[in-house]
Amino acid sequence: MRLSKNEMIILWGLVKYPMLNDRQLSDRIGVRMSTLNAIKNKMKRNDVIFDRIIPNVEIMNYEILSVLWTPLKRPIKKGKDLDILTSLFKDHPNTYSAMIFGDTLFALSLYKNYTDFRRAEYMIIKTLKGNDLLLNENTHNTLYPLSISQVSKNFDYTAVLERAFDIDPTDDKGEIEADPSKAKEKIFHLTRKEKTILKGILEAPDMPDNKIAARLDTTRQAVARHKKELLELGVIRKTRVIDYAKLGFDLLCLLEFHYNKIGAIEKGGPDVKKLHLPSFFAVYGNSETASLSLYMDFKQFTKSREDYTEVINRFCVQNGEPHVNLYSPADTITIKHQEYLPLVEQFLKDN
């Protein structure tokens, strides 16, 4: 899909500033309201961009992020294999995202403790083996304790679009983050009605407030009021994701490597913001990292890798060779994409 300059700027603005209304966004990125509305409607009509509302899971009692990826015996197409994997993860509430990149399975899951993780991992591996899908025993399942890890990107496509469209927002300061302590205080003291509305919003994030209200047997005003408060406190947030297969990307990279940090850095990763690395998922643990990135071509991949290597060598010493896996974005099959409702329901049940 070929985009005009205005379409590139507006698509980037929609992704970077999901919390702004149309008037605010028009002023922020410097385009006319009529142009913004026309292009936004076109993007949505063509399923290029999607609105989401996601919870702040970092304020809940989930302590471990699991990043699983494993080669499969064969590329997954429509049919029995896909049905098996879809059923596996649809019935697994801890996994919020699961994708297939050709012949590789990738999944992100949250767990309250190590016991829950081991129980779930056993069932996943058992299902893969039982259906002759697992290529070998060398599955990659790295655990990131959230208290000492940094999820720097969680399906945020801003930098992907900046690199692809050659956008350099040097003077941009982004949005102000909400105070996490207030969000945590709120999530632990929701009323019964607020819990019902929160689940209703997450179940149908694209649905207008009046339709959510009708499903929940409450008023539109109640839904709007509680949604506004939860957004302002940072209990939930708006986000936008793209269908990257429609935007001309040639390469998808899954990167993972282990390291020893240089210096006394206790938490977090290297400062790579100015590089505009085109990653949309990235996590840094105490001694390991994993990320997903998109590139328009191999030249862009090579340049980004050189820039990243220069910065990472000042941050850490790598242990062993990195896993650098390249795929065609067109081969992506999405089983789950940021489906947090089961995790939220379990949290609310326990609290």
Give a label for each model feature.
Residues 1-351:
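A compositional/biophysical signature of low hydrophobicity enriched in polar/charged and small residues
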